[in-house]
């Protein structure tokens, strides 16, 4: 029996699981519906190139910061962070005649704003103070969920006394504080970082993003796809595991307490089973947990009715359309900095932005260069534009590749429009494009299970904070939430929420125990040293086997036939897939062509020139 079951393997879920395993020695089972762990931190590959689905840049990763300590602990120090250029973001507002590079210093940022808008000098200084105060207010909210219960009342009192403008709508704050519409537009250019347009978002969401990048931005060397596999090592060290292709159907309740989950195993023919544990932690979002995984009637439904009503009242957040490009080369001037371009002159309206995007005339886009940030040799680009998920409802329930000609025409129009818009900000981009792939809210829904494909879970409106929904606690004993709906969105926001959840699970001593572990962590051994060891080994948790390459031969110029010997392996069947470690923290799924005796036979496509193509 496991000590805890975690539903989902996003960064919040993995943080909670990793801390419970590392700090308390807990045996944790993580259940992931897909064949790759990591949620929105996972990466995907095409022809050797890779794109990071949800991690585009991370702030507050300087040595000694709390997020840096947390990630160092979870990954055993194996994760290296590349610092982005000092001007990590470039804001382009053609309608206001502005192109501004954001510096990696809050003080320099304030001076820059004053130099551009000297007539707003006093208001800018007040704005910078308000941003820091709102940031401190949200930090206190995190602390309220981490500290022992006896300290919580004092923190909640401080929160009530120091709310200030934190729960004011961002657009209302900007209109009240600044006269110049160009300055208001510039300051809110990057609202896509928290997913709710200024007319709806709480000012604290804006403030958290501004302060998050106060000291610059970082990106994981090698890309974000390795993060989940690094944290997995800590989970496995105490007998836990990440189990893939597992659909959690229900959370099991006994006498008002969560006692386990009902799961469908889809690794081969679907099989239903139950797993029991005294602690159940959901990392798939509050809406999904309360409306799908838990009963909505009977005693449990009565306990959760108030929360479900509050969630329904909030409505949905925004989603996004992303165009993934490979280039022959990077255009002149591209250095890895992000580019935000917005052609609108008035306040951003997500409904109008969505209509324009679907017509192939997008107003705004976020442009990222993951290959440069990760230190990859391939030239890759991501162009993201935010959209209402309702625009894609007619294709809800359809499968990728089977959505019809109308969908193909729509995605082609959106891709052309976004590439054209990006080319205006980065001349020469269009001519360098080699391949194009498009993801819509339907893609996000498929990978996150968020209703409608909402990128950031519950929208960061004043109503969300007033309803006190951003918490790991639930009305059900033994059940906790983790991830962005238990705190704030983004990689660090979700990870800190995961830390809050671990503190709750561990009880009054949880916070000091975790802080002691982060402070006292010691360097770990190099994980790459044993990556080519061929001795047979079965490690903790799910079965892992060391295989010997028995035969490797070419079937065609692009396909290699590889037979692996696994003397202690259980019976495999043709048609199943195996995850094969092709490099440290790099696992690839391969379909089994056959599995005679103690061997398995794989057919490997080598066209990608990836790590698995070099056997």
Each model region followed by its residue ranges:
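Helical element adjacent to the flavin cofactor pocket in flavoenzyme catalytic cores
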Residues: 207-271
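N-terminal glycine-rich phosphate/pyrophosphate-binding loop and immediately adjacent elements
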Residues: 2-136
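Short beta-strand to alpha-helix junction loop
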Residues: 62, 159-172, 214-233, 243-245, ...
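Rossmann-like flavin
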Residues: 95-201
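C-terminal segments that line or cap access tunnels to active or ligand-binding sites in enzymes
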Residues: 329-439
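A glycine-rich dinucleotide-binding beta-alpha-beta segment and adjacent secondary-structure elements
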Residues: 180-194, 362-366, 424-488
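Ferredoxin-reductase
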Residues: 537-615
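Mid-domain catalytic core of redox enzymes
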Residues: 219, 249-376
């Amino acid at each position: 029996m496991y000590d805890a079951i975690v539903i989902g393997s996003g960064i919040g879920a993995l943080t909670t699981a990793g801390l419970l395993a590392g700090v308390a020695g807990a045996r944790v089972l993580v259940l992931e519906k897909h064949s790759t762990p990591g949620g929105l931190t996972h990466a995907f590959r095409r022809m050797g190139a890779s794109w990071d689905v949800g991690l585009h840049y991370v702030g507050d990763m300087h040595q000694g910061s709390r997020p840096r300590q947390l990630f160092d602990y979870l990954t055993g120090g194996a994760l290296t962070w590349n610092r982005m250029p000092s001007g990590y973001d470039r804001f382009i507002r053609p309608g206001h005649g502005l192109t501004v590079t954001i510096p990696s210093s809050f003080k320099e940022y304030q001076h820059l704003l004053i130099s551009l808008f000297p007539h707003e000098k006093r208001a800018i200084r007040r704005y910078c103070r308000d941003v820091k105060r709102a940031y401190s207010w949200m930090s206190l909210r995190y602390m309220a969920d981490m500290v022992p219960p006896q300290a919580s009342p004092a923190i909640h009192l401080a929160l009530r006394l120091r709310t200030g403008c934190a729960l004011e709508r961002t657009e209302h704050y900007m209109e009240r504080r600044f006269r110049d519409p160009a300055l208001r537009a510039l300051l809110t250019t990057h609202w896509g970082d928290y997913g709710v347009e200024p007319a709806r978002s709480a000012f604290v969401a804006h403030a958290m993003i501004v302060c998050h990048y106060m000291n610059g931005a970082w990106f994981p060397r090698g890309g974000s796809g390795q993060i989940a596999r690094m944290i997995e090592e800590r989970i496995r060290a105490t007998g836990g595991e990440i189990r893939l292709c597992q659909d959690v159907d229900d959370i099991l309740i006994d006498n008002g307490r969560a006692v386990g989950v009902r799961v469908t195993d889809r690794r081969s023919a679907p099989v239903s089973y139950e797993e029991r544990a005294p602690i159940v932690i959901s990392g798939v979002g509050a809406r999904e947990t309360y409306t799908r995984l838990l009963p909505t009637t009977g005693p449990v439904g009565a306990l959760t009715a108030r929360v479900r009503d509050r969630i329904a009242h909030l409505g949905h957040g925004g989603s996004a359309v992303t165009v993934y490009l490979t280039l022959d080369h990077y255009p002149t001037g591209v250095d890895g900095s992000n580019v935000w371009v917005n052609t609108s002159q008035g306040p951003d309206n997500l409904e109008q932005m969505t209509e324009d995007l679907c017509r192939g005339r997008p107003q705004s886009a976020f442009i990222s260069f993951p290959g440069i940030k990760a230190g990859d040799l391939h030239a890759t680009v991501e162009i993201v534009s935010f959209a209402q998920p309702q625009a894609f409802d007619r294709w809800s329930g359809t499968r990728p590749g089977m959505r019809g000609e109308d969908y193909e025409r729509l995605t082609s129009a959106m891709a052309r429009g976004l590439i054209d818009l990006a080319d205006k900000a980065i001349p020469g981009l269009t001519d360098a494009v080699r391949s194009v792939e498009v993801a819509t809210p339907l893609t996000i829904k498929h990978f996150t299970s968020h209703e409608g494909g909402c990128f950031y879970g519950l929208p960061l409106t004043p109503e969300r904070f007033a309803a006190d929904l951003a918490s790991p606690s639930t009305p059900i004993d033994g059940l906790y939430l983790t991830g962005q709906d238990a705190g704030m969105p983004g990689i660090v926001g979700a990870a800190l929420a995961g830390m809050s959840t671990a503190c709750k699970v561990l009880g009054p001593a949880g916070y000091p125990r975790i802080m002691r572990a982060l402070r006292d962590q010691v360097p770990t051994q190099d994980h790459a040293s044993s990556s080519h060891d061929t001795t047979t080994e079965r490690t903790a948790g799910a079965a892992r086997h060391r295989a010997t390459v028995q035969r490797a031969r070419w079937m065609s110029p692009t396909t290699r036939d590889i037979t692996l010997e696994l003397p202690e392996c259980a019976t495999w069947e043709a048609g199943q897939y195996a995850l094969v470690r092709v490099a440290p923290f790099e696992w690839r799924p391969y379909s089994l062509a056959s599995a005679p005796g103690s061997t398995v036979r794989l057919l490997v496509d080598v066209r990608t020139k990836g790590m698995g193509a070099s056997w």
